[in-house]
């Protein structure tokens, strides 16, 4: 986001933090232990590249598994696929922007202001759009799990595959437009406040859904258990799905919260020494964001036997080990 005369998500926040050094405090050029807190934490390009590549492969595997396995052709997994696409774009965009900046710094790429600005705007728009898509996809999954538990007998009439596809299309259309607008007007404090407000509003909404879900789930499961057939088994599977999504939400909050705290401090106390010290670790917060994209596919694999089975089949086919796929 372009919050200073330097462009790009990485450089704008780094330079904003450095430019906000309190008067009388040592800058990055001064010696002494105190100055270390105000220097931007440097992380090698190789780490960004590695995380980006791992996330790319993992999330492609998730998307391929959902497309390949017809048992995974359900609204919840379609929303998970949307989340995987968002995770993939976040990591790839972060890694790509880091590589471009490294090439420019090393003199291996044309250092023209207009070209750099346009490239950074594209990368930043992708990152911002993907962030919004992640939040909305998580909310869609939460609503889907809520319906399966509290409206179990009407679920297939309420949440059809066609309706899920329409929801995903609306999510990505809205998030793409919003992401571009956020970057175009990112120099405005109002835009940052809107982004922060959206993040916490969506988290509060999802938290309220899950609290209500788990508080009343046991009572509802007892009612379903009284019905003939596979009601109890199906309900238990739905609860397992709800727990999986709760884990995803928890990981999302842990990985993204430092970034949004950085934004809050950047707006509220840009010259406070403690705030500046926190903001100096911006690169670490980018790493946490990319780690979220790496962790999510592992959660899918750990929590879903069907996903693990499909992952194994795809990996075996990739390596030509067809006999092991049986």
From Swiss-Prot:
Known role: Receptor specific to the heptapeptide core common to adrenocorticotropic hormone and alpha-, beta-, and gamma-MSH. Plays a central role in energy homeostasis and somatic growth. This receptor is mediated by G proteins that stimulate adenylate cyclase (cAMP).
Matching InterPro entries: GPCR_Rhodpsn, GPCR_Rhodpsn_7TM, MC3-5R, Mcort_rcpt_4, Melcrt_ACTH_rcpt
Signal peptide (from-to): none
Membrane topology (Cytoplasmic): 68-71, 143-163, 212-246, 303-326
Family: Belongs to the G-protein coupled receptor 1 family.
Topology in membrane: Multi-pass membrane protein
GO terms classed as biological process: adenylate cyclase-activating G protein-coupled receptor signaling pathway; energy homeostasis; energy reserve metabolic process; negative regulation of feeding behavior; regulation of growth; regulation of metabolic process
Pfam families the UniProt entry points to: 7tm_1 (PF00001)
GO MF annotations, alphabetized: melanocortin receptor activity; melanocyte-stimulating hormone receptor activity
Lipidation (S-palmitoyl cysteine): 316
Record key words, sorted: Cell membrane, Disulfide bond, G-protein coupled receptor, Glycoprotein, Lipoprotein, Membrane, Palmitate, Receptor, Transducer, Transmembrane, Transmembrane helix
Topological domains annotated Extracellular: 1-46, 93-121, 185-190, 268-281
Gene this protein is translated from: mc4r
Glycosylated residues in this chain: 2, 15, 94, 108
Gene Ontology CC terms: cytoplasm; plasma membrane
Location within or outside the cell: Cell membrane
SUPFAM superfamilies linked to this entry: Family A G protein-coupled receptor-like
Name of this protein: Melanocortin receptor 4
Domain of life, per lineage: Eukaryota
Biased composition (Basic residues): 1-14
CDD domains (UniProt xref): 7tmA_MC4R (cd15353)
Segments for region (Disordered): 1-31
Oligomer status and interactors: Homodimer; disulfide-linked, also forms higher order oligomers. Interacts with mrap2a; decreasing ligand-sensitivity. Interacts with mrap2b; increasing ligand-sensitivity and generation of cAMP.
């Amino acid at each position: 986001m372009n919050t200073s005369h330097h462009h790009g998500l990485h450089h704008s926040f780094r330079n904003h933090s450095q430019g906000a050094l309190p008067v009388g405090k040592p800058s990055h050029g001064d010696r002494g232990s105190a100055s270390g807190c105000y220097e931007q934490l440097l992380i090698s390009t190789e780490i960004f590249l590695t995380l980006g590549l791992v996330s790319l492969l993992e999330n492609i595997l998730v998307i391929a598994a959902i497309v390949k396995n017809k048992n995974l052709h359900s609204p919840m997994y379609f929303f998970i696929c949307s989340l995987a696409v968002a995770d993939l774009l976040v990591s790839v965009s972060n890694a790509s922007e880091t590589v471009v900046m490294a090439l420019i710094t090393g003199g291996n790429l044309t250092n023209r202001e207009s070209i750099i600005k346009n490239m950074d705007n594209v990368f930043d728009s992708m990152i911002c759009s993907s962030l919004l898509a992640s939040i909305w996809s998580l909310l869609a999954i939460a609503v889907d799990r809520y319906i399966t538990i509290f409206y179990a007998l009407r679920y297939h009439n309420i949440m059809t595959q066609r309706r899920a596809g329409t929801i995903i299309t609306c999510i990505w259309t809205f998030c793409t437009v919003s992401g571009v607008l956020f970057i175009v007007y990112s120099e405005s404090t109002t835009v940052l406040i809107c982004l922060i407000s959206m993040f916490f509003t969506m988290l509060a909404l999802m938290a309220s859904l899950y609290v209500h879900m788990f508080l009343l789930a046991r009572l509802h499961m007892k009612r379903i258990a009284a019905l003939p057939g596979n009601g109890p088994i199906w309900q238990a599977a739905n609860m397992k799905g709800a727990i999986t999504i709760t884990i995803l939400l928890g990981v999302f909050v842990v990985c993204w919260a430092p970034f949004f705290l950085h934004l809050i401090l950047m707006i509220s106390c840009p010259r406070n020494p403690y705030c500046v010290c926190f903001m100096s670790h911006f690169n670490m917060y980018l790493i946490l964001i990319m780690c979220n994209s790496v962790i999510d596919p592992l959660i899918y694999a750990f929590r879903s036997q069907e996903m693990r089975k499909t992952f194994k089949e795809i990996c075996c086919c990739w390596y030509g080990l067809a006999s092991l796929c049986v």
